[in-house]
Amino acid sequence: MPIFRLPREPAFPDPALAEPDGLLAVGGDLEPERLLTAYAEGIFPWFDAESPILWWSPDPRLVLDPAALHVPRSLQRTLRRGAYRVSADEAFERVIRRCAERDRPGQQGTWITGEMVDAYVRLHRLGVAHSFEAWEGDALAGGLYGVSLGAAFFGESMFADAPDASKVAFVRSVEWLRSAGVELVDCQVRTEHLVRFGAREIPRAEFLARLARALEQPTLRGRWQLGGAGPPS
């Protein structure tokens, strides 16, 4: 199948036309309107500094139902100890920049380019991109970030600078998302790490159908706070 070159308008081809590896289109920009259009259609950007902007819609898709979250026994002990304080939206830019700096086995460089950082910081300021942080005292020990639309949360990346810090942030984030009415956490592509937490692969068509239902719900815009469902008023 051909790889589509995107027009200036924030429009995308049908995800069913993606290559077997999930690559759907090339080009365009990372302006908020295009990014939010992409997420609403089950498409996300993933590229490195040496390539043009690439857009993906893999089949199958890794997802997590918040109600199906599995917490390994060893991590349950860490959670009970309260080793980390977990927050939301207290350090979004620090989290995404730390994710960009993280060493990734088998990868040279990072896909979270400066252009990507700027784009997601803009989404954060619009109230649709969010971070969860794990703190050890006053030190940022780990965290993750993603995009929220309707009752769906699209996880993007996570990092840890201390043992289990990102895992604690992940578990607390999924628990909070469930309490806030989120029905679907998009994990994009399979990793054994996320499978251990209950994520599973589903066909792209099923993912898109579930996403469409999730988008019928209102988006939790604004700064999020843990300890309650939804952002502060």
Swiss-Prot record:
MF GO annotations: leucyl-tRNA--protein transferase activity
GO annotations of cellular component type: cytoplasm
Broadest EC class assigned to this enzyme: transferase
Reactions the enzyme catalyzes: N-terminal L-lysyl-[protein] + L-leucyl-tRNA(Leu) = N-terminal L-leucyl-L-lysyl-[protein] + tRNA(Leu) + H(+); N-terminal L-arginyl-[protein] + L-leucyl-tRNA(Leu) = N-terminal L-leucyl-L-arginyl-[protein] + tRNA(Leu) + H(+); L-phenylalanyl-tRNA(Phe) + an N-terminal L-alpha-aminoacyl-[protein] = an N-terminal L-phenylalanyl-L-alpha-aminoacyl-[protein] + tRNA(Phe)
Cellular compartments annotated: Cytoplasm
Chief place where the protein resides: cytoplasm
Keyword terms: Acyltransferase, Cytoplasm, Transferase
Disulfide-linked positions: none
Its EC number(s): 2.3.2.6
GO biological process, one term: protein catabolic process
Role description: Functions in the N-end rule pathway of protein degradation where it conjugates Leu, Phe and, less efficiently, Met from aminoacyl-tRNAs to the N-termini of proteins containing an N-terminal arginine or lysine.
Database matches in HAMAP family: Leu_Phe_trans
Family per record: Belongs to the L/F-transferase family.
Protein name: Leucyl/phenylalanyl-tRNA--protein transferase
Species the sequence originates in: Anaeromyxobacter sp. (strain K)
Lineage, opening ranks: Bacteria, Pseudomonadati, Myxococcota, Myxococcia, Myxococcales
